[in-house]
UniProtKB/Swiss-Prot annotation:
GO terms for biological process: acyl-CoA metabolic process; fatty acid metabolic process. Keywords: Acetylation, Fatty acid metabolism, Hydrolase, Lipid metabolism, Mitochondrion, Serine esterase, Transit peptide. Residues 1-42 form a transit peptide. The gene is Acot2. It comes from Mus musculus (Mouse). The lineage of its organism: Eukaryota, Metazoa, Chordata, Craniata, Vertebrata. Monomer. InterPro entries: AB_hydrolase_fold, Acyl-CoA_thioEstase_long-chain, BAAT_C, Thio_Ohase/aa_AcTrfase, Thio_Ohase/BAAT_N. SUPFAM superfamilies: alpha/beta-Hydrolases. The modification N6-acetyllysine is found at K83. Its main location: mitochondrion. GO terms for molecular function: carboxylic ester hydrolase activity; fatty acyl-CoA hydrolase activity. This is Acyl-coenzyme A thioesterase 2, mitochondrial.
Length: 453
């Protein structure tokens, strides 16, 4: 009987589907044994749509079919980053009366998350290696997300009923990746597939240095020419950042503005953390910047001097006695920077800027006081007759507001501090913030920079 069933399946269209999106196993139908239900043979399939592959910021539709009515199951997800670090999540579910389970309709009953969370198996992933942040280092290869369906509600003990592997890409089909070595500028430019010119954006990350491309590559798939810009600890750039010379960033701005596939007259800036601070300084000192999105950035120079021509902004003072220790043994440094209202020379002169700003703020950011900084920037701009910036605050969101579905990085090594610190955030609230922030910044840039010519 089993052999003949396999023969039927081999001849069916089900067995012709991509193995990366469909998997099936025989398991027994439910049997009643003295009032207890045990699960016998079923033909479970796990489907993931879009089929086979998708971009990282795309939502997925995950469903299981062929289960027994109301069968309890556990869904598990896993991926490894380029350094071999494992990230995993799991959630307990129960099939409906028809033996189906659709994550868009079925709430998780517990595990890494609970409730109706269709993308929880991604954003709720946690690293096996403590304090490890999920970063995509090579955007030319996908993350492989492994999904499994297990019988019962034990995340490690149930029989595997079905499995699938789904590719999560960071380059939309046709997006062009162009390494940039022009003068001193070290960067990578991402261009949409079709002919331009396109609205241009410079993308800046934080104090970790190097060249991170994954946000720029995803954003290029939305119709922007995006240049991921390195500014230290990459290639032949300086290995440390005692002084941030705005002339380097000016060279990058001029390069992007003059590119034949970039629409003028001005460009946009996107920066997070230290990158947000630098974006604010660029908008204050440099010409040709029409719009800037600052994600949890500082209004003051932090950890190093900012310099442009004959002008310098010294770093804000450190208040070492304000560093706290959490119950988990992490440093909490949110109170460890002097207020720029006290260290006034460290305040970036935003009043000089004619840039239109959007500030995206995690209200549980423990890296520094992002909400306070955004409010003070708004006050200063308005006091000098400038346009009031848009500020969007996200309750319980932490410091690293990434593109959608990246897991929360709530703690980790801070290179300027030289120790592990808490970055704040609650996983579900942070995931909600990331989805909204991603849409908000795209809408903002399209409005301020326009679409392609």
């Amino acid at each position: 009987m089993v052999a003949s069933s396999f023969a039927v399946l081999r001849a069916s269209r089900l067995c012709q589907q991509d193995w990366k999106s469909w998997a099936r196993l025989f398991v027994p139908p439910p049997l009643s044994t003295g009032g207890r239900t045990t699960w016998a043979r079923t033909n479970a399939t796990l489907s993931v749509e879009p089929e086979g592959r998708s971009c990282w910021d795309e939502p997925l539709s995950i469903a299981v079919r062929g289960l027994a009515p109301e069968q309890p199951v556990t869904l598990r997800s896993a991926l490894r980053d380029e350094k071999g670090a494992l990230f995993r999540a799991h959630a307990r579910y129960r099939a409906d009366a028809g033996g189906e389970l659709n994550l868009a309709r079925a709430p998780a009953l517990g595990g890494s998350f609970s409730g109706l969370e269709p993308m929880g198996l991604l954003w709720a992933m946690e690293p096996e290696r403590p304090l490890w942040r999920l970063i995509k280092r090579d955007v030319q290869t996908p993350f492989l997300v492994e999904l499994e369906v297990l019988d019962g509600h034990e995340p490690d003990g149930g029989q595997r009923l079905a499995q699938a592997v789904h590719e999560r890409h960071f380059l939309a089909p046709g997006v062009r990746r162009v390494p940039v070595r022009e003068g001193r500028v070290r960067a990578t430019l991402f261009l949409p597939p079709e002919p331009g010119p396109f609205p241009g954006i410079i993308d800046l990350f934080g104090v970790g240095g190097g060249l991170l491309e994954y946000r720029a590559s995803l954003l290029a798939g939305k119709g922007f020419a995006v240049m991921a810009l390195a500014y230290y600890n990459y290639d032949d750039l300086p290995k440390s950042i005692e002084t941030m010379h705005m002339e380097y960033f000016e060279e990058a701005v001029n390069y992007l503005r003059s590119h034949p596939e970039v629409k003028g007259p001005g460009i946009g800036l996107l920066g997070i953390s230290k990158g947000g601070e630098l974006g604010l300084a660029m908008a204050s000192f440099l010409k040709g910047i029409t719009a800037a999105v600052v994600i949890n950035g500082s209004v003051a120079a932090v950890g190093n001097t900012i310099s442009y021509k004959d002008e310098t902004i010294p770093p804000v003072s450190l208040l070492r006695n304000q560093v706290k220790m959490t119950k988990d043994g992490l440093l909490d440094v949110v109170e460890a920077l002097q207020s720029p209202l006290v260290d006034k020379k460290s305040f970036i002169p935003v009043e000089r800027s004619d840039t239109t700003f959007l500030f995206l703020v995690g209200q549980d950011d423990h890296n520094w006081k992002s909400e306070f900084y955004a409010d003070e920037i708004s006050k200063r701009l308005q006091a000098h007759g400038k346009e009031k910036p848009q500020i969007i605050c996200y309750p319980a969101a932490g410091h690293y507001i990434e593109p959608p579905y990246f897991p929360l990085c709530s703690a980790g090594m801070h290179l300027l501090v030289g120790a592990n610190i808490t970055f704040g955030g609650e996983p579900r609230a942070h995931a909600v913030a990331q989805v909204d922030a991603w849409q908000q910044l795209q809408t903002f840039f399209h409005k301020q920079l326009g679409s392609k010519s």
